[in-house]
Amino acid sequence: MKFIVKPHPEVFVKSDSVRKRFIRILETNLRSIIQRDTKGVEVINRRDYIEVSGLDGTYRNQVLTAVTHTPGIHHTLEVKQTAFADMHDIYEQCLEMNREIIEGKTFCVRVKRRGTHPFTSIELERYVGGGLNQAVESAKVKLKNPDVTVKFEVENEKLNLVIARHKGLGGFPLGTQEDVLSLISGGFDSGVSSYLHIKRGSKVHYMFFNLGGPAHEIGVKQVSHFLWKKYGSSAKVKFIAVDFEPVVAEILEKVDDGQMGVILKRMFMRAGGMVAEKLGIQGMVTGEALGQVSSQTLTNLRHIDNVTDTLILRPLINWDKEDIINVARDIGTEDFAKTMPEYCGVISKKPTIKAEKLKLEKEEAKFDFSILDQVIYDARVMDIRAIEKESQEQAPEVEMVSELGSDVVVLDIRSAEEEDESPLIIEGVEVKHLPFFRIATQFGDLDQSKEYLLYCDHGVMSRLQALLLIENGYKNVKVYRP
């Protein structure tokens, strides 16, 4: 078995040199992701597609996850590759694979062919289709809108029988576009906007303005690491945390109430622009949508943009909130966003929807900009790959357990979707499911006379959640790592 990875069609409208470069980058990205956790799997550039071979049942799911979550891929064909003697041999192999699939249904046959053969693609389609129609009495040929399309490819002396077709993310390979800096809060909007730029081929670095203490920062680190791990782990990117509480305190003390929201956003953009310039990044990404809150009117957005020369990208500018939430659900960030605290919206009681330049400048004249310079100077810059390591170092008091006694409860903190895909069943041990986003509010409702071992797939989320629980006074918490 092998995977035939088809780049997104937009790649093929590029010039020959650009197309080759894009596919080469996609090949490198896939190899980096796939060979990190597998052995013996080969990733080969076949010019117009990428072949992933050397698979067995052990690595099939890991590779499938990689090709369906890597930007720049339109679709992937999961194929069984065999040799063939002639058209009749091809027909017999197709019949063996598709007999049960087409029983009682309408079907057609579609062939792609490369190389020199004594038959054309249409001749082969007619031969195989006619044979299937005769061999399976309950099946009927229907060339338009059939129930089943029997697909296969003939590549020189090899026959690729298509087992399944898996949709890809689309977009451009990661790293083909310039880097961007996402101003991420952990909510629905910033997570989706970050994903859209990953999908479009930009390496996304994350910048977080902390207004809510350690718990908020841990939450945003979790969603940033999740996005990177799931969609962009072939890239080395940074996570920048800025303690913005001194800036907020200065605004609350000195700035007129109605101007606070816009001025806070202007401070965000100033800070982001300063960091972007240091990192050589040309654009900042925000999750702002037109009219969603008072600071996001056209007038206010214009005043916000004017404080920096760095390009500000707003991929969600015309999106409805419902559509944003739907995408967050699809990409896996909805559960993070549901419980992520949002602080910016409550900074002003009577926010202006049409700020005036002179008023803003008058209020900002009261602001001590050395505070902004200091928080940027003190910003913590880290490789996003270090978040997993940091979670271990920050929580050395969290005991790691690999063997279980019968008197403990394993707390599966994965999302419902992850639990459904691979349920955690441990013979003789009680397993409860409490998603990570409900830990803070519902852990206290559990029987505190018992010991709880938190479990997630990679151990990052479980360690971070254990740290939060211990900081809140719970002593009956450990991490389960089988």
UniProtKB/Swiss-Prot annotation:
Its main location: cytoplasm. Keywords: ATP-binding, Cytoplasm, Disulfide bond, Nucleotide-binding, Redox-active center, RNA-binding, Thiamine biosynthesis, Transferase, tRNA-binding. ATP binds at L183, I184, K265, G287, Q296. The active site is at C456. The lineage of its organism: Bacteria, Pseudomonadati, Pseudomonadota, Gammaproteobacteria, Vibrionales. The keyword Lyase does not apply. The keyword DNA damage does not apply. Pathway: Cofactor biosynthesis; thiamine diphosphate biosynthesis. Its EC number is 2.8.1.4. Residues 61-165 form the THUMP domain. GO terms for biological process: thiamine biosynthetic process; thiamine diphosphate biosynthetic process; thiazole biosynthetic process; tRNA 4-thiouridine biosynthesis. Belongs to the ThiI family. GO terms for molecular function: ATP binding; CCA tRNA nucleotidyltransferase activity; tRNA binding; tRNA-uracil-4 sulfurtransferase activity. Disulfide bonds join C344-C456. This is tRNA sulfurtransferase. GO terms for cellular component: cytosol. Residues 404-482 form the Rhodanese domain. It catalyses: [ThiI sulfur-carrier protein]-S-sulfanyl-L-cysteine + a uridine in tRNA + 2 reduced [2Fe-2S]-[ferredoxin] + ATP + H(+) = [ThiI sulfur-carrier protein]-L-cysteine + a 4-thiouridine in tRNA + 2 oxidized [2Fe-2S]-[ferredoxin] + AMP + diphosphate; [ThiS sulfur-carrier protein]-C-terminal Gly-Gly-AMP + S-sulfanyl-L-cysteinyl-[cysteine desulfurase] + AH2 = [ThiS sulfur-carrier protein]-C-terminal-Gly-aminoethanethioate + L-cysteinyl-[cysteine desulfurase] + A + AMP + 2 H(+). Catalyzes the ATP-dependent transfer of a sulfur to tRNA to produce 4-thiouridine in position 8 of tRNAs, which functions as a near-UV photosensor. Also catalyzes the transfer of sulfur to the sulfur carrier protein ThiS, forming ThiS-thiocarboxylate. This is a step in the synthesis of thiazole, in the thiamine biosynthesis pathway. The sulfur is donated as persulfide by IscS. InterPro entries: Rhodanese-like_dom (IPR001763), Rhodanese-like_dom_sf (IPR036873), Rossmann-like_a/b/a_fold (IPR014729), ThiI_AANH (IPR020536), ThiI_N (IPR049961), THII_Thiazole_biosynth_dom (IPR026340), THUMP_dom (IPR004114), THUMP_ThiI (IPR049962). It is found in: Cytoplasm. It comes from Aliivibrio salmonicida (strain LFI1238).
